[in-house]
Amino acid sequence: MIRLRYFASLRERLGVADEWIPLPDAVSDVEGLKHWLQDRTGPWREALSDQRLQVAVNQELVKADTPVRDGDEVAWFPPVTGG
């Protein structure tokens, strides 16, 4: 199982803050997980298509080719802006 967490406006768009899912067999990295999530029905494709999204695995910012393993926590959040 992996824990998925969604923050800020992304959480609002998806209507979920976090969830536990079995790691899909076809998923080996962050990019693959993103594509798998985008195949869900509802707002997933559009919400995760923003190229500015940040992703962290086990609380460390990572790139799309970072491996995802059983037991990981993967967090998605929009870019942080300030004024």
Model-derived segments and spans:
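Ubiquitin-like/PB1-type beta-grasp interaction modules and other compact soluble beta-rich domains
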Residues: 1-82
